[in-house]
Amino acid sequence: MRDVFFLAMLPVLLFLMAKRPFIAVGMWIWTALFFPNAWLYGIGANFRYNLIFTAVTIVGYLVMKDKPKVRFGTLGGLILLFFFWTLASTAMSEGVPAVSWEYMTRFFKVILLFVFVVLIVDKKLHIDFFLWCVVLSVGFFGALEALKYIVSGGGHKIEGFSGHVLGDRNELALAFVIALPICYYLLQEYGKQSKMLRLGMMGVMGLIVAAVIGTQSRGGFIALMVLAAYFFVKSDHKIPLAIVGIILAGILSQFVSSEWTTRMDTIGTAASDESFMGRVVAWKLSFILAMNHPFFGGGFKALETYSVWLDLSKDFFSYSFFYTGDALPDTEHPHAAHSVYFQIMGDHGFVGLAIYLAIMLRAFLLARSIALRAQAHLGLRWVVSLATMLQLSIFAFGVGGAALSFAYFELMFAIYGLLLVMDTRILPRALKQQISA
């Protein structure tokens, strides 16, 4: 039945996407995060929906009559510079060339999404639709899995679909955390229009928090706690927020297992935790890879190439200041970098890391700048709210990504695109209209 329903809806969706390219770019991110193929079992599972929606987006933009004026600004310039830097590092890859180019192709699709967000999204309706697509993908999956977790009394382990960008439970947990501020923005904007919608969005947010717990991801839990603290500091409703937090924590404590508690307890004893120190070993080898190739690094997935891993392991004791305790490199299997920062360092060198950090910092500060500029104008409260929430999402990614190989997550580059649109088109246009009025 799923296949029949989805395939019956597909022509309608394609028609709407062709007529309104902003719908197409929203469906692009929806398919990227929701992975509809995993929900379908018959003929519907054989279609490449993301590719189809991407093609419709591109064609839809090309035939648009009134294309928005495009300015990429500093943030866009940094992102495009980083993209060309990854091209150079891929061309000089130390790993398996075919693997490096495969991941380069994947990253090209991420950059393509960023570009078309900037090209097409032009007003509040477009942004809100895009964010609803995010919530109806990541948020829907999180809420559904959280219900299973609660019904099972905490026994259900929440994981992503195999082969999906969010297949790993740690990356899935971080995606849930990143989606929470987006949910809050939509709650603020649309919750006042309907009591049912307000209660529904509050329920979804509570379930997403439960989903983070259900993944048993330490990185996701840390990101959630740091986000909660940061959100509490920035909130104007600290007492109600604290009460809700205490109630939610009390409810969720009834479902966590002893296994979850034991796993979270290792956060405080990371230096003696074998799993964590294994990550530190991977960080050090990423650092050594960058020291050997400081400008362009080893290319995509070079660290996870067995021959490269073994060669780097020979220099493991060269940098004694990089503490790894008693942990040593695995001589049988290479490992991922387990940190967006060390991942970029190893893949694209110190220069690539500098560009990547500049992108994150510029986006974070740009969100703050947008909120401050819009704050004095009553008609732009939604801009203040959205910029603040996107800043929180960037902050959550910066914290949670410190222990995950998740540097090329498309949602983050889409968020950068939304900030760019707000800064270069929506905010200047709104301010100009208010001045002329």
Report each predicted region and the residues it spans.
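Membrane-interface micro-motifs in multi-pass membrane enzymes
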Residues: M1-D3, G44-I52, E102-R106, V165-I178, ...
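Transmembrane alpha-helices of multi-pass inner-membrane enzymes
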Residues: V56-G60, P240, I359-A363, L392-A437
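Alpha-helical transmembrane segments of multi-pass inner-membrane proteins
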Residues: A8-M17, L80-A91, F108-L113, H126-I158, ...
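A membrane-periplasm/extracellular boundary helix in multi-pass inner-membrane enzymes
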Residues: L147-S152, V209-T215, F231-E274, K284-N292, ...
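Membrane-interface helix caps and helix-loop-helix hairpins in membrane proteins
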Residues: L40-G44, M92-W101, I213-G214, A402-F406
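Transmembrane signal-anchor hairpin modules in multi-pass inner-membrane enzymes, especially those
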Residues: M1-A88, P97-A98, D122-W132, L186-L199, ...
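Long extracytoplasmic/lumenal interhelical loops at the membrane interface
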Residues: I158, G163, G268-K284, F296-H348, ...
